């Protein structure tokens, strides 16, 4: 048997005939994506939310030195990428002007919509036909992905994440001190955000979460309903979390008690 547990959604490599091999047992954390694969009649696909080793984190944090706590203390912190290099920006100049405006408007509209993804509806057959002239879409002969799936997630999804994260960080920095831990700073578009560089996932990141008054999570819109790993990372370190709304939160958390989630940018502020 081969057992896998996804941490990204959707995993585009799963859209391949090999997922039907009887030796594959696949666990998916995003229930929306799990239901999609279940509808494809996969025998060994299961829904399993992500998790964190809280005992490891407890031991790590118990041994954190005072100077480390001071080093990683923040009013508001965000640990994550800004997707400053993404596939959408790579093709932007090759898009017709009206398509640029079309997608720019879609990004602005999606910014304040949570729990729904409008990209599914805006990629009409005519738009997809136009995009096929601009995007070098190639795939393995055993793959069953299509240009809509690829463009929604690889192009629009990561560009949306960039747009949203920069917008949110700049809004927060108007009212409070914001520390950003990233190797992907997009310095020219950030305003009054303090860039702190990278932190190691296993050793230093939990210390940031424990020492921050508010930890931010911005779920990439490709994850339709599931709870991203970053949420579990913060909670496992005992950190306070402010996050965008995800439908599956309602099955695990109480808003205002376990976590605090927002459903609009004004609500976040």
Task: Describe these PLM feature segments.
Residues 3-16:
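A short, histidine- and acid-enriched strand-loop-helix "catalytic/donor-clamping" loop
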Residues 4, 28, 217:
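Redox-cofactor binding/interface segments in oxidoreductases and associated redox assembly factors
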Residues 7, 50, 81, 263-264:
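Active-site donor-binding loop signature of nucleotide-sugar glycosyltransferases
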Residues 9-12, 53, 268:
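Short acidic loop-to-helix transition motifs that present clustered carboxylates
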Residues 15-27:
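A conserved, positively charged/aromatic
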Residues 61-206, 210-211:
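Conserved catalytic-core segment of nucleotide-activated headgroup transferases in glycan assembly
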